[in-house]
Amino acid sequence: MQRLDPWHGRCELRFEHRQTEHGDAGTVHQGGCSAPFKLLRAEQGKNGRCELPILHTAGGLVGGDQLSIALDLNTNSRCLITSVAAQKVYGSIGRSRLHPEGQWARQQVHCKLANSSDLEWLPQELVLYANALFEQHLTVQLPANASFLSAEIVRLGRTAAGETLQQGRWRSALSLCRRSVEPHQASRWELVDRLDLGGDALNDQHGLNKRPVFGSLVWAAPMPLNGEALTQLLELVRSDREGLNGTMRCSALDQGLVARYSGPSSRDARFWFSRIWARTRALRALSAPQIPRVWPLQEQPLPPSSFKTNTAVPAVRTH
């Protein structure tokens, strides 16, 4: 049987806020990608935000595949990047005579944000099949007045089919660095987060304790949050867990927050993260988020009217 070469897909995008003689034209994008990536039509959301879905045309990743995404946001640009479907990673261990130990599929995402820019990185669920090996890196560089939100959910094994990750493994590395505007001041690492889930960590009570779904949300805020405002925000985020199943925790960053989900339900993880997403918009007096058109959801994860500008936490306009 003919051996197929692995994919080495790249996607490079640049976002720019445009002003025309007729007024604010919002954020536009330039760039391109190589197979298996394909860009769908971008839409202009509220507040001039460019909403761009990325399609992975191969239908999933196998061992040896490598994907690279680079996002560059100019001053005052706003964008929401999502994926068209859940990303599947197929089993690798024991499937090849050349590599019986399996091969890793890898994805690297690099984000560079300029002053007053705003990036929402919201891919759909990642599904790892039994014996899959997947490693992802997310690197973000941004100044103190830029906003970055990411929410990622991974399912370790096809639970509905009675499948676990078995000998598979998932590794994740997130690095978030605040650039200094002063030449003599060094950049500051706001978050360096590394996870390695596989083996005993999947079943141990100090690990996932046999819970098949794990999720992380990170928000780097574009303004300082004082003690009272941050405390109130965390209380509201914790109240958003009501009616959802799983273990959900959140804590503060130097300028933002991080939330974790572990449990049985990617739906409940998505619901909680969507509510937090709405909170971060309301806190900055931005329009309530709308679920991207490519998300195949049968239920609405946001409240009927989403969140109005919070009365407990004063809204701050960033730009």
Swiss-Prot record:
Molecular function per GO: nickel cation binding
Keywords associated with the record: Chaperone, Cytoplasm, Nickel insertion
Location(s) in or outside the cell: Cytoplasm
A GO-annotated cellular component: cytoplasm
InterPro entries registered for this protein in UniProt: UreD (IPR002669)
The keyword Cytoplasm appears for this protein: yes
Stretch list, region Disordered: 298-319
Superkingdom of source: Bacteria
Function as written in the Swiss-Prot or TrEMBL entry: Required for maturation of urease via the functional incorporation of the urease nickel metallocenter.
Family from the record: Belongs to the UreD family.
Subunit note: UreD, UreF and UreG form a complex that acts as a GTP-hydrolysis-dependent molecular chaperone, activating the urease apoprotein by helping to assemble the nickel containing metallocenter of UreC. The UreE protein probably delivers the nickel.
Name this polypeptide is given: Urease accessory protein UreD
Species annotation: Synechococcus sp. (strain WH7805)
